[in-house]
């Protein structure tokens, strides 16, 4: 590990140790009323958003805690311990608000003994780096919208998004340092893996967000414009570590994402009966072709900066 990376690592570990958000994720005493009384049009999609968020946060907690338990390196143990702490705190905070909706999410299945699938560390680095950074971009974009238009803040949880997303950003910085400390992860055939994970994360978000039209409407956000803004922020941040980037400004990128979303909607409407029906098989093939088109679009080459730490300035 180079001296530059070591110095930056020590600075980042100090930030984790200070734990500036230790008291942030608490529901205030003056916010104990029931906040589940929201517009019926947005109710289901907002609840789905909360449930998917708590599942994601708790999954991250389980992953990081498991890695901490298995690694031998003291630096890694400290890092994954800090990140598991943060993810657990986020999940617990969402759960405080879900109680208003009389919803208890049973996440015990994530911790029960099961057969583990082992992935090479590089795959975890690529995927979790992107997950944390795109999480930052998503939360800060929503926060800036309700900060600018307070009348759109239909639930108090949005007030926490600014500091919340800074936790996500800091986690991403840790993975950036890990990858920059090992140049082999960022060249050769690994460039194809980086491109694959970029596309998989972006495409998943695009498809999912277009299934929540009323939630975005309540925030006066177009799902497409919101997603493209998030992609722009994530792409800009990713320049710190990825030598290859998606050309999100290429008109064919958005065109194929829209087609991917449309085909996915068609697949869901076809139901689960006759899972191997001709119609469903055709849709699966079309989805695969569409994703392949996106993958083989020309990428952008990015020269990695020497000073690669990024500040959450969006």
Region locations from a protein language model:
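Non-heme di-metal
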Residues: 1-314
């Amino acid at each position: 590990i180079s001296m530059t990376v070591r110095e930056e690592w020590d600075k980042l570990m100090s930030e984790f140790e200070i734990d500036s958000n230790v008291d942030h994720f608490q529901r205030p005493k003056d916010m104990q009323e029931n906040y589940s009384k929201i517009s019926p049009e947005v109710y289901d999609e907002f609840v789905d958003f909360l449930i998917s968020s708590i599942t994601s946060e708790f999954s991250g907690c389980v992953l990081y805690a498991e890695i901490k338990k298995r690694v031998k390196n003291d630096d890694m143990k400290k890092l994954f311990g800090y990140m598991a702490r943060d993810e657990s705190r986020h999940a617990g905070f969402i759960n405080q608000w879900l109680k208003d909706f009389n919803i208890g999410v049973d996440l015990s299945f994530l911790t029960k003994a099961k057969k583990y699938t082992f992935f090479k560390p590089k795959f975890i680095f690529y995927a979790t780096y992107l997950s944390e950074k795109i999480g930052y971009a998503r939360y800060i974009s929503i926060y800036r919208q309700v900060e600018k238009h307070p009348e759109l803040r239909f639930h108090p949880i949005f007030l926490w998004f600014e500091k919340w997303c800074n936790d996500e950003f800091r986690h991403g910085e840790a993975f950036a340092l890990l990858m920059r400390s090992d140049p082999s992860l960022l060249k050769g055939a690994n460039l194809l893996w980086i491109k694959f994970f970029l596309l998989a994360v972006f495409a998943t978000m695009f498809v999912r967000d277009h299934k929540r039209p009323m939630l975005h409407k309540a925030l006066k956000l177009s799902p497409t414009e919101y997603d493209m803004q998030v992609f722009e922020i994530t792409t800009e941040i990713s320049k710190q570590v990825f030598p290859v980037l998606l050309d999100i400004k290429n008109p064919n990128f958005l065109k194929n994402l829209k087609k991917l979303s449309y085909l996915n909607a068609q697949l869901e409407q076809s139901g689960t009966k006759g899972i191997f029906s001709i119609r469903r098989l055709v849709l699966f093939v079309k989805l695969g072709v569409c994703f392949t088109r996106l993958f083989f679009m020309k990428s952008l080459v990015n020269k990695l900066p020497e000073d690669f730490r990024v500040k959450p300035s969006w």
